[in-house]
Amino acid sequence: MVVSEITVAVGAVIEDDSGRILLVKHVPERGGFWQGKWICPGGGLELGEKIEEGIKREVMEETQLEIELTSPLLPFERIVKQKGKTTLHVIYIDYLAKLTGGKLKTGSDVCQAIWVGKKDLPQIWEELHEDTRKLLKTAKVI
């Protein structure tokens, strides 16, 4: 598959009152680039949607949690090529966020969600998606 569009993915590195970070895994049926790895909650920004609104919507859809965005993180991008053709071009726009409400419950496209202590993140390093590793380093939580 060759893509002709750039995806803008928005999300959050969410911390609870105990200093733990929220990670999710997508359902197997969804497939795709992030399948089978732990990632931070997020997804595609919709046309006409403000970045902050998109982040809060995606977090609510995937986890049923309410958050407060505290500070933006440096955006980064990923370009995936197969046989010389671009199959994915995504620009990540993420924020640090604090949990403010709700009860953790996975949405329809998420099969697992866990809170992980910052000191425990190295233990699941290989289970983190490579872009999530970069994001967590940018957020200075690892």
How would you name each of these model-derived features?
Residues 1-22, 96:
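Conserved N-terminal beta-strand and adjoining loop/helix that marks the start
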Residues 15-20, 29, 46, 78-79, ...:
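Short, charged/polar surface micro-motifs in flexible loops or helix N-caps
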Residues 2-6, 37, 85-91, 110:
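A generic structural micro-feature
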Residues 31, 105-142:
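Nudix hydrolase/Nudix homology domain
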Residues 43, 57, 70, 116-119:
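Structural detector for helix-capping/boundary residues
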Residues 64-101:
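Active-site segment of metal-dependent pyrophosphate-handling enzymes
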Residues 14, 94-98, 114-117:
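Short, well-ordered beta-strand micro-motif
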Residues 20-61:
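Conserved Nudix-box catalytic region and its N-terminal flanking loop in Nudix hydrolases
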